[in-house]
Every structure is written in structure tokens, then in C-alpha cells.
Amino acid sequence: MMILRLALAIVISTYATAQPASTSSLVTYIFGDSLTEVGNNNFLQYSLARADFPYYGVDFSGGKATGRFTNGRTIGDIISTKLGILSPPPYLSLSQNDDAFLSGINYASGGAGILNETGIYFIQRLTFNDQINCFKKTKEVIRAKIGDGAANKHVNDAMYFIGLGSNDYVNNFLQPFMADGQQYTHDEFVELLTSTLHNQLTTIYKLGARKVIFHGLGPLGCIPSQRVKSKTRMCLNRVNEWVLEFNSRTKKLLIDLNKRLPGAKFSFADTYPAVLDLINNPTHYGFKIANTSCCNVDTSVGGLCLPNSKMCKNRQDFVFWDAFHPSDSANQILADHLFSSLLSSSSPSPAPKPRQ
């Protein structure tokens, strides 16, 4: 957890000292999947990975679906509030005249993965490579606005949050109809993932990113969509072991990149222990149910909370909103944990705190 505290320390210190071209606020660029999406897929006409319908957003400001895959806020939304900045808007919602290019953008897309083939059955989504290309275009817009030198400094000073890899398992390797799960052993697959990620992170570095936080995977074997595969509805230990191997390999990758790339400050945020403790001990944090979701979903047809799904009455009792995504209340606990880890940096990282 020391790596997590280092990552968050970089965030706060950057927020306090960085001076981007047009604002003294922290500038953040976010890459990810449905855990951090804020509405990019709303603009993809044929995407099947969308959350722009009820009951998504029922607890968000205004009570309407925004494209966030939860009943309320993402962890990114909550952290942005704690940092005193607005949650960055979705890239596909912007025109080149928008000031958001200078204040932060969210490129995350539901269904996205590290590998291009991940989530292909969603028809449209922004893969990690697509998101990197969007960032490349963003830099071109910034350069046109403020000039080459200022643009380079701007992207060097910004913070980059990356959270990908979950779909490479849940919507690729673990799916019997996807080729990767049939073609590769897990050792081969995790090597493919991390070698691809190596190239992608190197590309982002060449585009100017220096302060990068990569969010490791949580215990995917314990999410509702995986538990239903067990006769006892218990966590799938094999899946969790694979996740831990991916996390370990990714940590080593980031350490290697920091050694080889001048000025790189790539950090790994290990949230696996905190999420697992929340799932294993829900009552300690004010929850009642962690083995199924608030929205009664059909995991055989995607596991999303559709308008005809049955929603639970007490949403605050559930760790999970749908078959894949945490509830607003769980996201609050996990976001609080990230900050409490930083504040207690002189001592071992504490477990998440219960709701007040």
C-alpha cells in the first residue's frame, strides 16, 4: 500500500504546485473503462455498452442517467470533489473550442480494454489505443491554443489516471466464445496484456505524460457476474489469483518504466485489498449485501440494469449496483480510503472507514 500512498501524494503535491497554462487547478486526464466512464459511449451510436437509461444515475445529481455505470457517482467523481475540481467531461462531448481541453478530459469508455479485441461484441467502444489517439488529438488542440512550448509543459504537468484490464478478463479471457481464452494459457495471456500495456504507456509518455497513476484490478472473482458461475455463489479463487498476477506484473512494469524513461513518475494504486475487505466484511462498512447486486440483472444478457430490471428498495445496503459495478455508497467508501491512505502515510495504510 506504500505505492498507493506515493501515488496519492503525487496527486496532492501536483495540485498544490503545478501551474498549467490557463489555471492553477490540477489538470487530470482519465483513461479507463465503465468504472470511470462519464458518458463517452452515449456518443457512439451503435455501442451496446451504454448506461444512458434508467435506473443508472437514479442517485446522481438530477436523478438522470449520464452514462455512468452506477446509480450515482464514480470514484473519480468523488475524488475530483475532494481535490476541489470538476469531474472532467467526456471527450466525445467536446468541440475544439471547449476550455476543457486545458482543464482535463475523461476518455474512459465502457467495454474498453488493453487489447483491441476486448469487448468487441459491444460493437462500439473506445479501446485503450483509441483513447490514446484521442489524447494525441487533444494535445494537437492544446498546441493550437497555447503554442508548442506551453502545450508541452501543460501535458507534462498534468496528472494521468489509468484504470484498465478488468474487461480484458471479464469480457475477453473469461468468455468461452472469445478466441483469447481458447488460444492462450493465462501465463501467455498476462504476458500479452503487460507487453501491450508497456507499449501503450510508452506511447503516452512520448506524448508528454509524466505523472501517471495506474489503478490495479480489484478481486474480479468476487463481482456478481462471476459469483453466479459458482454453485455456492462464492468468489472464484482462480480468477482472483489471475488478477493478483496481473497486478504484480503491472507493478514491475511501472517500476521498469520509471527506471528507463527520464522524468517518469508512474505509480501503481493497489485497491485490491480494500475492495476485498469491503466485500468480505460489508457490515463493518454499513452495508448488508455484497454477494449480489441491488439491481436484479440477468447476467446471461450483459448484467446491466435495464429499465425493466427490478431495483432494490434500499440501495445503500448493497456494495454492488449491477453485476459489475459498485454502488454510489461503495464508491464513496473506496474514495475515502484513497485519501485516508495518504493522510496516514507515516503509518501502515488503514482499511476503509465505515460510513458515518
Swiss-Prot record:
Protein name according to UniProt: GDSL esterase/lipase At5g37690
InterPro entries per record: GDSL, GDSL_esterase/lipase, SGNH_hydro_sf, SGNH_plant_lipase-like
GO molecular function: hydrolase activity, acting on ester bonds
SUPFAM superfamilies: SGNH hydrolase (SSF52266)
Entry's EC annotation: 3.1.1.-
One biological process term in Gene Ontology: lipid catabolic process
PANTHER family per UniProt: GDSL-LIKE LIPASE/ACYLHYDROLASE-RELATED (PTHR45650), OS02G0732800 PROTEIN (PTHR45650:SF16)
